[in-house]
């Protein structure tokens, strides 16, 4: 009799297993609670597996038993920002930062570990092609609003990256938090027409029109100014393809070059150094007002500012778009103006 009961139990278990293989949501009513990585308690492992198949493919079991308040720490393993602090995984893929690598252990690359800090070596993989593995629009539902350079607010950095891949390749994050009325000033930095009214930049490159030159100050040629109207003279024109071999992220993490120009990030500076061996790093952060170039003794225009919105408050009680813009005002409009603090001025500070 005992043997028959054991056989019946085994047969029932096998039937349940077959059912689960046929339809993952045909689950027994047995109460055997487990905690999911989304912070929810499921009646049994089969119910968790059902939820996984019904729209939450990254769901995994955290532990047996119901979830408690601490288990919510496991929600959204892919809630990562887009700060460029690359790490190379032992799968020879460059990840945007450590968080993105840890996210991959839950999604595309289970068990991946850090091989070393920095981008993977060029001979192993093209770093910029693999910063976002899989579908860039498979985003967590986490609410961590960011403001895009198109003036739109995105639910989180992943949603902004999705929009970038879906038809807006020049889109970048301006700042964390929702956009406000001032952020629309930064829309469409490089939306230029093709009218041929050439100008020659002081980088000896001919630009199709003034708008294209101004666009270059945000992308390939930070700090470039108009040398004269019309095309550059052929004998002085330099190779315009120098920078095409440099694949740099469109992240604004400014550094100051020894030529007195502010570069959007260290990668762009290194790219310019490759064609200008005398150029070097002066310091991290934007160049100070009227930096004296070491090689030429030339004083750069203090109003060659990027339009990234990183507000600062001046001692005049006014909010400036970024530190460079405050420096420009100090040199041209408000002598003696200094930085009061980072961030917008408070109402009580406004004069």
From Swiss-Prot:
Subcellular location: Secreted
Keyword Repeat among UniProt keywords: yes
Pfam families in the record: Kazal_1, Kazal_2
Disulfide bond residue pairs: 25-50, 27-46, 35-67, 78-103, 80-99, 88-120, 137-162, 139-158, 147-179, 190-215, 192-211, 200-232, 246-271, 248-267, 256-287, 303-328, 305-324, 313-345
Family annotation (Gene3D superfamilies): 3.30.60.30
Propeptide: 1-131
Domain Kazal-like, chain residue ranges per copy: 19-69, 72-122, 131-181, 184-234, 240-289, 297-347
Keyword entries, A-Z: Disulfide bond, Protease inhibitor, Repeat, Secreted, Serine protease inhibitor
Gene Ontology BP terms: negative regulation of coagulation
A GO term from the CC aspect: extracellular region
Major location (coarse): secreted
Record's keyword annotation contains Secreted: yes
InterPro entries the UniProt entry points to: Kazal_dom, Kazal_dom_sf, Spink4-like
GO MF annotation, one: serine-type endopeptidase inhibitor activity
Highest taxon of the lineage: Eukaryota
Site description Reactive bond, residues in chain: 141-142
Function field: Thrombin inhibitor. Prevents blood clotting to allow insect to feed on blood. Also functions as an inhibitor of trypsin and plasmin.
Name of this chain's protein: Serine protease inhibitor dipetalogastin
